[in-house]
């Protein structure tokens, strides 16, 4: 199983990123756990300086899908260990392809959720393939999540880093980075296809 940041889908809300706690190694982080000291969720609108990405509010991400628009979306937050591993790769691949990245931050600096349950519910139809059930059976979005959207539909996506990588324990190996680069490049390439 991949380690990753995730957001809880129990209540309908936007994507959030948090650090997965527990014994199972994952390539993503649990972002919805408001009570978790390890929650890693992106929040608010980052300045263009945050990774050099274009800030996008959660409601605007939902509207992008509903209005049939296109773009490369990144859901995550600065304190998420898996996001910190994936962002440099995403930056590199997007720069090489000349693709802008829209950043949806799911938690603020105090790791408070920046989305409502209603917002989360509205995004589920578009991102359910990139969500998973948490240990309580609640549909959750783990971050980082990178999706290419064309005409309001996800054409490619990537969750977490790579299978077998636990960002809490260390950085990706050279082989894991190569695998992550290939997977993220596929998503970026799908976003540049007009």
Predicted regions located by residue number:
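Non-catalytic, surface beta->alpha helical segment in thiol-disulfide oxidoreductase systems
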Residues: 137-194
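Thioredoxin-like thiol-disulfide oxidoreductase module
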Residues: 104-155, 187
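N-terminal leader/targeting and pre-domain segments
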Residues: 5, 24-68, 170-171, 179-194
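The canonical Cys-X-X-Cys-His
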Residues: 80-83, 146
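C-terminal motif of bacterial Sec signal peptides marking the signal peptidase cleavage site
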Residues: 16-18
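Bacterial N-terminal signal peptides that target proteins for export
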Residues: 1-10
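Short active-site neighborhood of thiol/selenol oxidoreductases, capturing the structured segment around
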Residues: 66-78
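Typically the conserved alpha-helix immediately C-terminal to a functionally engaged Cys/Sec
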Residues: 84-97
